[in-house]
Curated annotation (Swiss-Prot):
The gene is hisF. Keywords: Amino-acid biosynthesis, Cytoplasm, Histidine biosynthesis, Lyase. Pathway: Amino-acid biosynthesis; L-histidine biosynthesis; L-histidine from 5-phospho-alpha-D-ribose 1-diphosphate: step 5/9. It catalyses: 5-[(5-phospho-1-deoxy-D-ribulos-1-ylimino)methylamino]-1-(5-phospho-beta-D-ribosyl)imidazole-4-carboxamide + L-glutamine = D-erythro-1-(imidazol-4-yl)glycerol 3-phosphate + 5-amino-1-(5-phospho-beta-D-ribosyl)imidazole-4-carboxamide + L-glutamate + H(+). Pfam families: His_biosynth (PF00977). GO terms for molecular function: imidazoleglycerol-phosphate synthase activity; lyase activity. This is Imidazole glycerol phosphate synthase subunit HisF. The active site is at 22, 141. One of its GO terms (biological process) is L-histidine biosynthetic process. It is found in: Cytoplasm. IGPS catalyzes the conversion of PRFAR and glutamine to IGP, AICAR and glutamate. The HisF subunit catalyzes the cyclization activity that produces IGP and AICAR from PRFAR using the ammonia provided by the HisH subunit.
Amino acid sequence: MYADRDLPGAGGLAVRVIPCLDVDDGRVVKGVNFENLRDAGDPVELAAVYDAEGADELTFLDVTASSSGRATMLEVVRRTAEQVFIPLTVGGGVRTVADVDSLLRAGADKVAVNTAAIACPDLLADMARQFGSQCIVLSVDARTVPVGSAPTPSGWEVTTHGGRRGTGMDAVQWAARGADLGVGEILLNSMDADGTKAGFDLALLRAVRAAVTVPVIASGGAGAVEHFAPAVAAGADAVLAASVFHFRELTIGQVKAALAAEGITVR
C-alpha cells in the first residue's frame, strides 16, 4: 500500500522499531507486564528481552531528579552496554557537554537533549561539533497550541515539564533549527497523542518531515499494530513506543510484520 511512495522504508533504509523505557533512580517507572522476568523493574533485563525480540534500538528516558539518580543511570547504561548490542539512546536531564560525554563513555550510542537546548540552542551545535551529529538527538515535546494562547506559525508549540508547560516556540521551526545546528535526528513526541493509544499525530509528523532532512522518530500515541505504517507514510524513519510493548499488547515482531505487509522495509 505504501511501497510506491518516497518513504523511509520503501525499498530504502529499514524503518527502526524502538521501545522506550522510563527510568527513575535505576528502576523502570511504568509497570511492565513480561512473564518470566526475575525483576520487571530492572531496565537492563528488559533491554535484553527487547534485544532478543528484534528491537532495532532502545531509548532510556531518565526521569530522575536527583544527582544520585544520575550516577545510577550511568551505571544502568554501563550494564546495558555490556549485555545489549543494539544502539542505545539516553535522554532526560542532559544539560551540558559534560553530561553527553559521561553518557557516551558509559556506553550510550546517542544522547537526546530537550529542555537545556530550549534555554541555550547553541548547546546543540557545541555537542554536535564535539561528538558528531550522529550522537546528538533533539527531543521535541510538541502539542497543539491551546485555545487562548498566542498562536505559532505551524499551530504546534514546544513544551517542557512533560507537556505541561508551553514555551510559545513553534515546534516545527524548532525541529528545523535543531537540524540546522547539527543534530543528527529528531525525536518527535506528540503530547496530544501521548497516552491516548489512538495513533501517532500524522499531521505533526508531516509538518516536521517537510521541514527537516534528518531522520525523524515518531513518538506518542501508538496503541495498535495498524498505527505504525501510517506514521511511516507520514514521514517517520523510526517508530517509538512504550506501554504497548511493556504490557505485551504488541510485540516488536508484530509491528515489524505489519510494516512489512505494507511494503515497508524492516530489519
